[in-house]
Amino acid sequence: MMLTGSHGTFCSGVALTRSLVLTAAHCVLPGADYKLVEFDSARQPLLKDVATITRHPGFDVNAVLRHRVTADVALIKLGAPLMVLPARLAPEGVAVTAGDPFVVAGYGVAVRGDGKTGGVVRAARLVATGQPGTLQIRLADPAGKGERAGLGACTGDSGAPVYREVGGTLAVIGVVSWSTGPALSEGCGGLTGVTPLMRYRAWIVEQAAKLGSPLPP
């Protein structure tokens, strides 16, 4: 899913039910109006009204700016159902180790600073690097390992789902929070910072039920 804000920003997200979208909390800050963008079979955009936005109470926007750990998770309740097939939330207890493969899918730009390249869903296969855990996961293109330019999240990919194969199918294990250029420079194509959902899964399930969009067991 693609999310647009009245301040001119855009992010990505993923439908957990036909009326509930998961994204990054920093994508839906107070002080702006937001719309979900769904594309029909002819690739024509359809704007969906947002009914409510629920950010995790532990979210700290300053932590995201510093690439630090925070509860960068939010749920968007829509005013009308989507046409898409919802994604599956990864179950509890999925371990992550360095080298594990992931798939990131978002609507971000292909070239930093070129907004015209955004708005098209793209997927990248990345691997966990460093010391991944329940607080933060850092992904990199296995070819460049974060030191050379490669695949990764860019502007507009914040909030995008991060998938991991669980039981033979892909499940959402995290959302994109930030990105860097090669060797921790500014930009894209280096590291992709992910907020894993393990610590926030219970909150997501609880809030989904309160919002009238319970997740499947």
Predicted regions and their residues:
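Chymotrypsin/trypsin-fold serine protease catalytic domain
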Residues: 70-73, 78-150, 190, 197-202
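Extracellular/periplasmic catalytic domains that process cell-envelope and extracellular macromolecules
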Residues: 15, 29, 45-47, 66-70, ...
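Surface-exposed loop/turn positions
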Residues: 20, 32, 100, 157-160
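N-terminal activation segment of mature serine protease catalytic domains
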Residues: 1-8, 12
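Glycine-centered low-complexity coil/loop motifs and glycine-rich tracts
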Residues: 151-155
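C-terminal subregion of chymotrypsin/trypsin-like serine protease catalytic domains
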Residues: 10, 15-28, 36, 43, ...
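Solvent-exposed loop/turn segments at secondary-structure junctions
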Residues: 8-10, 21, 27-29, 60, ...
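Conserved catalytic-core segment of clan PA serine endopeptidases
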Residues: 34-84, 89-94, 116
